[in-house]
Curated annotation (Swiss-Prot):
Keyword Cell membrane found: yes
Keyword DNA-binding (UniProt): no
GO molecular function, one term: protein tyrosine kinase binding
Domain Fibronectin type-III: 885-982, 987-1086, 1091-1187, 1191-1285, 1379-1473, 1474-1575
Secretion signal, residue range per the UniProt entry: 1-17
Annotated segments matching region Disordered: 1718-1809, 1920-2013
Positions of disulphide bridges: C46-C102, C145-C197, C246-C293, C335-C385, C428-C484, C525-C575, C617-C669, C711-C766, C809-C865, C1307-C1359
Function: Cell adhesion molecule that plays a role in neuronal self-avoidance. Promotes repulsion between specific neuronal processes of either the same cell or the same subtype of cells. Mediates within retinal amacrine and ganglion cell subtypes both isoneuronal self-avoidance for creating an orderly dendritic arborization and heteroneuronal self-avoidance to maintain the mosaic spacing between amacrine and ganglion cell bodies. Receptor for netrin required for axon guidance independently of and in collaboration with the receptor DCC.
Species name: Rattus norvegicus (Rat)
Segments on the Cytoplasmic face: 1616-2013
Entry domain remark: Ig-like C2-type domains 7 to 9 are sufficient for interaction with NTN1 and commissural axon outgrowth. The transmembrane domain is necessary for interaction with DCC.
GO biological process terms, semicolon-separated: axon guidance; camera-type eye photoreceptor cell differentiation; central nervous system development; dendrite morphogenesis; dendrite self-avoidance; dendritic spine development; homophilic cell adhesion via plasma membrane adhesion molecules; locomotory behavior
Name by which UniProt lists this protein: Cell adhesion molecule DSCAM
Subcellular location as annotated: Cell membrane; Cell projection, Axon; Cell projection, Dendrite; Cell projection, Growth cone
Length: 2013
């Protein structure tokens, strides 16, 4: 097999790489300028780089690659350009002040950097100076540092000095960005100092100090503004901060107004007016324009006008950013430019500029678009867009990646052998860009259409071309080498392989071949047929190969000729194929060798312009004919060039008769023949002799100025210009000019002299040469003109006040010269009497003298003499100082201490003579200066001194003198000062500690002794630390203010049960005194903070677990360990929790005994101290060990045929482990044979075959665990029968399932024949067949399936099986578990930081409650927190709540099914309210002249700790408040440093967590003599004419409007009240109807006796309640708030039977003993959500707090239960003459005499007057421990249908008409509580029960309905059983009874009832018995047993209470 693949590619320059990681980039693209000092040199790294490493080169801007100049310039291998330090004489513009650029090149391409201007700065001397300034006191002064223009660009101001002290920008001194010094609010003393600026050269680092300047300060005088600082133009880049100075001097202070482009400028945002002028932040180009600063006051105006130029930085961006294309495609690039306009844009490719050409187009505005067509591979690389404007430039680049679009073979056919007539398909898969064209050949012959070959192709989704060649029936001639060729503009690729067709071998005729000499040639032998033996080649009968250039491939018949030679290789070649050993065939081919041309190399010699050129191109070898052509620069030579070409045979000549510059270029000679085309290229360079473009001419130069001597020339090569100089005007003797920093040659050849001096005058010669032709030169004469200059003058001079002074200056320059004298800015005229000016000429100089007669202080300052001529002006500044004795210093107190006083003085005018010393005098205030203590000759360098050894609090007088060389000053101002206080010398007294809690200690103490206080005690520092005898702990310090002589402070957040040491220190203004003696105490004990660790539990037996744990550390105990408590409970299999138990021990281990076998237990351990239980540990789980199981719970056996029986059983009730198997025993007595059969643990039936017919067998079953066999079940007998009756092996029982699951009820029946099975469900006591639908079906095995089980699927199901011989039935009780109902959540107790919640669980949904989730949120907050709560809990206390804050709560119960409904949101508020100030307390304790003591005891914290105390005060009529903010409130607070005899405003703000309170007050300090000042008077000024008519009318209209408004408000209140009443009545009626609807629609049928019915609950909102119960000896007040639950069944029954009073009895589980208040409702809000609270009706205003009062007495143990009666105010039916006795029931009913009744019962508190209060009291009465076994009777009032105000109860003879105070809305009229039943007496021997009140002591309120369905329960005996069964099993029927079942009264009950009542009861009982269905006694007993759970059923029994249609009573048991 063979495969030959050849690739032919076009020839491209290898300048591009497709390496994926090849890239170029810039490391510092912003580098555009490098300035350096000539003395230091510089290193300039190339800004470009790349990966892989790049080649870096540097070029001049002209494109010339730079070269190393030893010692001057060097390019390092890493591309860094170094310029070496050099002296000024070696300065070269070409090197040291030129533009460079750098290139980086790698296979990715080539990029060039932006132009980098490199400039060397020569070191030249310069001076900076500052001029004296004038200003007015209180105004602004501006000093400027004047820098010479020659160095201004390099020198910056770094600081200013005042005398020798550096100034920093601050409140009064400001240094601007331009280096100016601003002095704000100038004072006289500012004129006493010298000011100078310090500059630094940016590049040389040299610093210069200016001369000293003075500030002359004058008194303010009215004057027009004069500009001190301004600007004429500013340049900035966008984004920079711009400062435009504008400052003027004037009085009054002038106003500033800014205009931009003649429009007022709005000063806001980015534009800000500052002290210095205008500040522009983040400048923009739009900010450019003309700015005017107008300065004006009432005396005149001034302006500063300037322009601002904000330039946008140039930025170029090329898009697209990534260019990836292919060869032959078009590429378009766009360059977007931001920044200045009119910029120049150019394109570069690989560092070379791009010009428009054949395939290159540059279009768009400013040439922004580059379009390149027909891209070739050399076009790839880096493309750059350069933008240039002035000296700014920017660039961007992008790499253009050209993919190799050369075709590539992806997959192709392979060599194969086929048989004749066999179809052949060849495939060639090719890719390339552009899409290649595929052609096919067979043995180098094209395959044509119709030749038996079919060619087709397709393009895949990947862009590949797939070409197919198909041969439907191959023949021998179809064999050969097939080649597929793919061709596109990028290249060609081919693939070939041989296809052999079996058949006789032969050779297809071969075509002659033409070979090219010097190249390789392949000759293929075109063999067809297969197989054959060999292929051989011959030439001239010689077997090939016979030399090294010949290679014969015998396997495929190919001959290769390398480096073909015409003489050797041309000729006949024969291919011989050996077909059989003795048979061969052959074919010959002729090879002709063609020789390509070879051009003899030629080069252009050096030619000059105008010469003639003749260049021959000779082809020295190659086959004829040969064609020769010429090209210039790659294109045909245009005829316009005048070039002549002569061709003769194998030669061609190029002739140019007259050379010019346009002939420059590359000339190429191209020779072609049949073999090839070759070329040779040479460059023609035409040289041009130099000539002048600008010739030098005579010029004048001004001394000190710059001059340019023009001279420029052109030529090729670029000519060199050399300058020479001949000094003077004589015969020129030219010498080369030494170039330096002052004299430079410009790039155009001109000569620059930066600073002309007199020696520069003379002849200058400009010589131009370029080695082409003769040099040219031209001379010129430079004349130097000298401007007027001051050559001599004194810089400074001194004069003595009152004496004569002369000053002179000398001028030099071109005559005539005028000299003028100035003083400051005033010209000195001859009219000035004290000044005399004289001038004289001495040679070339002019001397001028100024005389002053005599000198005064004002003569001090700067005088200047000005010299002026035609060429310039100069001036000399002379500083005259007039000396005199100094002014006295201004002294002030710098620091006062207890025993030292430090003075500070400011020296006034020093008399222009240095101060030589100071004298200080100090005396007691009462002494004379003669006895003063003096300190002389204090150093003049000092400006402060300290006086020592003074007495604290003593008063002294101090003054001082200044001295200089001239004399002594007058005495200074006299100051009087009192020494400071000293720190206390004694500790606080009587320090006592008292622990108040486990984390707090109360500290009390008294102030130090008076004589040791050393001032006013202002506060104390308390230091405390944990006390340790061996430790050295640092004290924690707390600072507090003083409140009086005795202090109290409580330390909080301390460690529990920890010993602390404490000290107290007193503080005054001077500091802190000594500490008190350290006192030790210990915080109180607390519960442990952490649980025991490492709790481990191991099961030791089936009934015991061993537990161990680690003891707690001392830090975690928080007290003395009393022991450990282990809490444990069983986790039952069904997910329920067992009883929670706990065991106490003192050891860290415990053995739990008596546990359930093989049961998983949850275990927690806690430690407890004397303070209580600590934190429980995390639950751990341990299972007891296995034991032998109990007996199976049941066994059944039934005959299935004559020889086979089935046995079924139930698992043991006590598994005691994992059941491994069951063993079934079968035996018969005759003979005794016991057979054992094993069944798997998950099997509960077994088939026993092969039994004898009609023989009885004994069967029993045993369960087996890993511990062994358990006890056997009961033994049953069974007999195989041929006619086996139907029997059911499944057991009856209860099936429990969660809702929404699929449930299968099994019913396995056996018998012979097989029995039929049917299912029925008990419906209202009557079984009926189950409904078969999509949710219910019966399997073939008899099982009944219910899918997605629901609550209504609960009930009793019967499975009946029967056949011909018998039947059987089982009953399955299906219980469906649902999520639990919502709990009933109430608030039971509140404190200032905690809220205790209690709840009653709702219906558990058939599954025990697993836990609760309590959620809470602070009011007005959307954030909710949550707590998981144990299922056994019924209350929860939330700690660490905010005081006086409302909170919202919800509770959710969870059972095995999931979470239930969320309870209603209830709200509660922690105790506390905002602070308030007591009116009985006086705010101001004491007031004197400068101090006020505030009495803060009057602030009541409202029960919540004060969190902040803010006090502000200010003098009356001012706007600035003085603030004192504290976090704690002390007893008193002292305001210090007040102004005497001043009225003050005072406002206080005190806050706690409940809110804030404010208090305002005014007070006045006393006069200095202790007298008071006049009070504040607000005067009202009224005109004498009195009120006008219009004013009187206005008052009348105002009063009328107020009266009308009050009237409207009163009417509105009446309407709102009536509407609220109507809405309230409507809501109650709606609640009634809703309850009836819920009763009828939402009743959940319950077939399970142990489960209470599920009902929809409604929330009841009861804001307040009050319950009154008297006790004979004591009275206890219990605050209460609760929620009432009534049921819709009750409400509905009441609606149906209004004429009856129905009593319901409910079992209620007792709660724990309560000894304190049940709940505090003083801050309760109505409603369970914020909207309800806001809309609730306000309660009675007469009382602020409600009390629930219980009167409890202890019953005698032998007292029997009393009869419960409804205790209406109606007369009780009795015999005539009977005496009323107080009822033994607890009753509350409406009272007519409300005021009298309440007063007699509640003392000063009002009794309840609303239904809500009684309903809440009733709810919590049920929860009281004392009433756990009491009976409650409720009488409920309903709305009268007749809307009557009178409620009637019974007949007329029993009617008691209620007054209008009786409520006309529904509610509980009363409820009563009676002692327990006799059988409960033993359990309540020591329990208190309530005593009933009189009928008049009643409280009334309406009911809020929340319905629970109530089930009836009968009385003992037949009627009771029937009632119970009816209520539990047939609830629907129980509601259809005409009358409820009533119990017969007990003897005690009968004694309290009337005869008519008993008759009514008997008649009702008869009716009830007649209608009740009969049930089996066992079932009723079971039902009674189930109903005793905590969620007990409610039963109804009636008591006939007369004919009152609006009352019914409820009795709860």
């Amino acid at each position: 097999m063979w495969i030959l693949a050849l690739s032919l590619f076009q020839s491209f320059a290898n300048v591009f790489s497709e390496e994926p990681h090849s890239s170029l980039y810039f490391v510092n693209a912003s580098l555009q300028e490098v300035v350096f000092a000539s003395t230091s040199g510089t290193l300039v790294p190339c800004p470009a780089a790349g990966i892989p490493p790049v080649t870096l080169r540097w070029y001049l801007a002209t494109g010339e690659e730079i070269y190393d100049v030893p010692g001057i310039r060097h390019v390092h291998p890493n591309g860094t350009l170094q310029i070496f330090p050099f002296p000024p004489s070696s300065f070269s513009t070409l090197i040291h002040d030129n533009t460079y650029y750098c290139t980086a090149e790698n296979p990715s391409g080539k990029i060039r950097s932006q132009d980098v201007h490199i400039k060397a700065v020569l070191r030249e001397p310069y001076t900076v100076r500052v001029e004296d300034q004038k200003t007015m006191r209180g105004n602004v002064a501006v000093f400027k540092c004047i820098i010479p223009s020659s160095v201004e660009a390099y020198v910056t101001v770094v600081s200013w000095e005042k005398d020798t002290v550096s100034l920093v920008s601050g409140s009064r001194f400001l240094i601007t960005s331009t280096g100016a010094l601003y002095i704000k609010d100038v004072q006289n003393e500012d004129g006493l100092y010298n000011y100078r600026c310090i500059t630094r050269h940016r590049y040389t680092g040299e610093t210069r100090q200016s001369n000293s300047a003075r500030l002359f300060v004058s008194d303010p005088a009215n004057s027009a503004p004069s500009i001190l600082d301004g600007f004429d133009h500013r340049k900035a880049m966008a984004g920079q901060r711009v400062e435009l100075p504008c400052k003027a001097l004037g009085h009054p202070e002038p106003d500033y107004r800014w205009l931009k482009d003649n429009m007022p400028l709005e000063l806001s945002g980015r534009f800000q007016k500052t002290v210095t002028g205008l500040l522009i932040e983040n400048s923009r180009p739009s900010d450019s324009g003309s700015y005017v600063c107008e300065v004006s006051n009432r005396y005149g105006t001034a302006k500063v006008i300037g322009r601002l130029y904000v330039k946008q930085p140039l930025k170029a961006t090329i898009s697209p950013r990534k260019v990836k294309s292919s060869v032959g495609s078009q590429v378009s690039l766009s360059c977007s430019v931001t920044g200045n306009e009119d910029q120049e844009l150019s394109w570069y490719r690989n560092g070379e500029i791009l010009n428009p050409g054949k395939n290159v187009r540059i279009t768009g505005l400013n040439h922004a678009n580059l379009i390149m067509d027909h891209m070739v591979k050399s076009d790839g690389g880096a493309y750059q867009c350069f933008v240039r404007k002035d000296k700014l430039s920017a660039q961007d680049y992008v790499q253009v990646v050209l993919e190799d679009g050369t075709p590539k073979i992806i997959s192709a056919f392979s060599e194969k052998v086929v048989s004749p007539a066999e179809p052949v398909s060849l495939v060639c898969n090719v890719k390339g860009t552009p899409l290649p064209t595929v052609t096919w050949t067979l043995d180098d012959d094209p395959i044509l259409k119709g030749s038996g070959h079919r060619i087709s192709q397709m393009i895949t989704s990947e862009g590949n071309v797939v070409s197919y060649l198909n041969i439907s029936s191959s023949q021998v001639r179809d064999g050969g080498v097939y080649r597929c060729t793919a061709n596109n503009s990028a290249g060609v690729v081919l693939y070939q392989a041989r296809i052999n067709v079996r058949g006789p071998a032969s050779i297809r005729p071969m075509k002659n071949i033409t070979a090219i000499a010097g190249r390789d040639t392949y000759i293929h032998c075109r063999v067809i047929g297969y197989p054959y033996y060999s292929i051989k080649w011959y030439k001239n009968a010689n077997l090939l190969p016979f030399n090294h250039r010949q290679v014969a491939f015998e396997n495929n018949g190919t001959l290769k000729l390398s480096d073909v030679q015409k003489e050797v290789d041309e000729g006949e070649y024969t291919c011989n194929v050996l077909v059989q050993p003795q048979l061969s065939t052959s074919q010959s081919v002729h090879v002709t060798v063609k020789v390509p041309p070879f051009i003899q190399p030629f080069e252009f010699p050096r030619f000059s312009i105008g010469q003639r050129v003749f260049i021959p191109c000779v082809v020295v070898s190659g086959d004829l004919p040969i064609t020769i052509t010429w090209q210039k620069d790659g294109r045909p030579i245009p005829a316009s060039l005048g070039v002549t070409i002569d061709n003769i045979d194998f030669t061609s000549s190029l002739r140019i008769s007259n050379l010019s510059l346009m002939h420059n270029g590359n000339y190429t000679c191209i020779a072609r023949n049949e073999a090839a085309a070759v070329e040779h290229q040479s460059q023609l360079i035409v040289r041009v002799p130099p000539k002048f473009v600008v010739q030098p001419r005579d010029q004048d130069g001004i001394y000190g100025k710059a001059v340019i001597l023009n001279c420029s020339a052109e030529g090729y090569p670029v000519p060199t210009i050399v300058w020479k100089f001949s000094k003077g005007a004589g015969v020129p003797q030219f010498q080369p000019i030494a170039l330096n920093g002052r004299i430079q040659v410009l790039s155009n050849g001109s000569l620059l002299i930066k600073h002309v001096v007199e020696e520069d005058s003379g002849y200058y010669l400009c010589k131009v040469s370029n080695d082409v032709g003769a040099d040219v030169s031209k001379s010129m004469y430079l004349t130097v003109k000298i401007p007027a200059m001051i050559t001599s003058y004194p810089n400074t001079t001194l004069a003595t006040q009152g004496q004569r002074k002369e000053m002179s200056c000398t001028a030099h320059g071109e005559k005539p010269i005028i000299v003028r004298w100035e003083k400051e800015d005033r010209i000195i005229n001859p009219e000035m009497a004290r000044y005399l000016v004289s001038t004289k000429e001495v040679g070339e100089e002019v001397i001028s003298t100024l005389q002053i007669l005599p000198t005064v202080r004002e003569d001090s300052g700067f005088f200047s003499c000005h010299a002026i001529n035609s060429y310039g002006e100069d001036r000399g500044i002379i500083q005259l100082t007039v000396q005199e004795p100094p002014d006295p210093p201004e002294i002030e107190i710098k620091d006062v201490k207890a025993r030292t006083i430090t003075l500070r003085w400011t020296m006034g005018f020093d008399g222009n003579s240095p101060i030589t010393g100071y004298d200080i005098e100090c005396k007691n205030k009462s002494d004379s200066w003669d006895s003063a203590q003096r300190t002389k000759d204090v150093s003049p360098q000092l400006n402060s001194a300290t006086i020592i050894d003074i007495h604290p609090s003593s008063t002294y007088s101090i003054r001082m003198y200044a001295k200089n060389r001239i004399g002594k000053s007058e005495p200074s101002n006299e100051i009087t000062i009192t020494a400071d206080e000293a720190a206390p010398d004694g500790p606080p007294q009587e320090v006592h500690l008292e622990p108040t809690s486990s984390q707090s200690i109360r500290v009390t103490w008294k102030a130090p002794k008076k004589h040791l206080q050393n001032g006013i005690i202002r506060g104390y520092q308390i230091g405390y630390r944990e006390y340790s005898t061996g430790g050295n702990f640092q004290f924690n310090i707390i600072s507090i203010d003083t409140t009086g002589d005795s202090e109290v402070y409580t330390l909080d957040n301390l460690n529990k049960f920890t010993q602390y040491g404490l000290v107290v220190q007193a503080c005054n203004r001077a500091g802190t005194g000594p500490s008190s003696q350290e006192i030790i105490t210990t915080t109180l004990e607390d519960v442990p903070s952490y649980p025991p660790e490492n709790v481990q539990a191991i099961a030791t037996s089936p009934e015991s677990i061993s537990i161990s744990w680690s003891t707690l550390s001392k830090e975690a105990l928080n007290g003395i360990l009393q022991g450990f408590r282990v809490i444990y409970w069983a986790n039952l299999i069904d997910g329920e929790l067992g009883e929670i138990k706990n065991v106490t021990t003192t050891q860290p281990s415990l053995e739990l005994d008596g546990l359930e076998k093989y049961t998983n237990y949850s275990i927690q351990v806690l430690a407890f101290t004397r303070a209580g239980d600590g934190v429980r540990s995390e639950q751990i789980f341990t299972r007891t060990k296995e034991d032998v199981p109990g007996p199976p719970a049941g066994v059944k056996a039934a005959a299935a045929s004559a020889s086979m029986v089935f046995v079924s059983w139930l698992p043991p009730l006590k598994l005691n482990g994992i059941i491994r198997k069951y063993t079934v025993f079968c035996s018969h007595p005759y003979p005794t044979v016991i057979s054992e059969f094993e069944a798997s643990p998950d099997s509960f039936s077994y088939r026993i075959p092969n039994l004898s017919r009609n023989r009885q067998y004994s069967v029993w079953v045993v369960a087996v665990t890993s511990a062994g066999r358990g006890n056997s079940s009961e033994i049953i007998t069974v007999e195989p029968l041929a006619k086996a009756p139907a029997r059911i092996l499944t057991f009856s029982g209860t099936v429990t399932t969660p809702w929404m699951k699929d449930i299968v009820l099994p019913c396995k029946a056996v018998g012979d024949p097989s029995p039929a099975v049917k299912w029925m469900k008990d419906s209202n006591g009557t079984p009926s067949l189950v409904t078969i639908d999509g949710r219910r079906s019966i399997f073939s095995n008899g099982s009944f399936v219910i899918r997605t089980v629901k609550a209504e699927d609960s009930g009793y199901y019967s499975c009946v099986a029967n056949n011909n011989w018998g039947s059987d039935e089982i009953i399955l009780n299906l219980q469906v578990q649902v999520p639990p109902d919502q709990p009933r959540l109430t608030v039971s107790k509140t404190t200032s930081s905690s809220i205790t919640l209690s709840w009653l669980p709702g219906d558990n949904g058939g599954s025990s409650i697993r836990g609760y989730i309590l959620q809470y949120s602070e009011d007005n907050s959307e954030q909710w927190g949550s707590f998981p709560i144990s299922p056994s809990e019924r209350s929860y206390r939330l700690e660490n709540l905010k005081c006086g804050t409302w909170y919202k709560f919800t509770l959710t119960a969870q059972n095995g099914v999931g979470p239930g409904r969320i309870s209603e949101i209830i709200e509660a508020k922690t105790l506390g309210k905002e602070p308030q100030f007591s009116k009985e307390q006086e705010l101001f304790a004491s007031i004197n002249t400068t101090r006020v003591r505030l009495n803060l005891i009057g602030w009541n914290d409202g029960g919540c700790p004060i969190t902040s105390f803010t006090l502000e005060y200010r003098p009356f009529g001012t706007t600035v408040w003085t603030t004192a903010q504290r976090t704690s409130l002390s007893k008193s607070y002292i305001l210090y440093d007040l102004q005497e005899a001043t009225w003050y405003e005072l406002q206080m703000r005190v806050c706690n967590s409940a809110g804030c309170a404010e208090k305002q007050a005014n007070f006045a300090t006393l006069n200095y003599d202790g007298s008071t000042i006049p009070p504040l008077i607000k005067s009202v000024v009224q005109s004498e004419e009195g009120l006008t008519t219009n004013e009187g009318l206005k008052i009348l209209v105002t009063i009328s409007c107020i009266l009308v408004g009050v009237l409207l408000l009163f009417v509105l209140l009446l309407v709102v009240r009536r509407r609220r009443r109507e809405q309230r009545l409507k809501r109650l009626r709606d609640a009634k109807s809703l309850a009836e609807m819920l009763m009828s629609k939402n009743t959940r049928t319950s077939d399970t006796l142990s489960k209470q019915q599920q009902t929809l609950r409604m929330h009841i909102d009861i804001p307040r309640a009050q319950l009154l119960i008297e006790e004979r000896d004591t009275m206890e007040t219990i605050d209460d708030r609760s929620t009432v639950l009534l049921t819709d069944a009750d409400f509905g029954e009441a609606a149906k039977q209004k004429s009856l009073t129905v009593t319901h009895t409910v079992h209620y589980q007792s709660v724990s003993q309560a000894t304190g208040p049940l709940v505090d409702v003083s801050d309760a809000r109505p409603g369970t959500n914020p909207t309800t609270r806001r809309n609730a009706k306000a309660g009675p205003t007469a009382r602020n707090r409600y009390a629930s009062q219980w009167t409890l007495n202890r019953p005698h143990p032998t007292i029997s239960a009393h009869t419960l009666t409804t205790d209406w105010r109606l007369p009780t039916p009795r015999a005539t003459g009977s005496v009323d006795k107080e009822s033994d029931s607890y009753s509350v009913s409406p009272s007519q005499d409300t005021d009298r009744a309440r007063s007699s019962m509640v003392s000063t508190e009002s009794a309840s007057s609303t239904y809500e209060e009684l309903a809440r009291a009733y709810e919590h009465a049920k929860m009281e421990e004392q009433l756990r076994h009491a009976k409650f009777t409720i009488t409920e009032c309903f709305i009268s249908d007749t809307s009557s105000e009178q409620l009637t109860a019974g007949t007329n003879e029993y009617t008691d008409s209620l007054t209008s105070s009786t409520p006309s809305e529904s509610g509980i009229c009363r409820f009563t509580a009676s002692p327990p039943k006799p059988q409960d007496g033993g359990r309540v021997v020591n329990m208190a029960v309530p005593k009933a009140h009189r009928p008049g002591d009643l409280i009334h309120l309406p009911p809020y309905l929340r319905m629970d369905f109530l089930l009836n329960r009968g009385a003992p005996g037949t009627s009771r059983d029937l009632s119970l069964g009816q209520a539990c099993l047939e609830p629907q029927k129980s509601r259809t009874l005409k009358r409820p079942t009533v119990l017969e009264p007990t003897p005690m009950e009968a004694s309290s009832s009337t005869s008519s009542t008993r008759e009514g009861q008997q008649s009702w009982q008869q009716g009830a018995v007649a209608t009740l269905p009969q049930r089996e006694g066992a079932e009723l007993g079971q039902a009674a047993k189930m109903s005793s759970s905590q969620e007990s059923l409610l039963d109804s029994r009636g008591h006939l209470k007369g004919n009152n249609p609006y009352a019914k009573s409820y009795t709860l048991v």
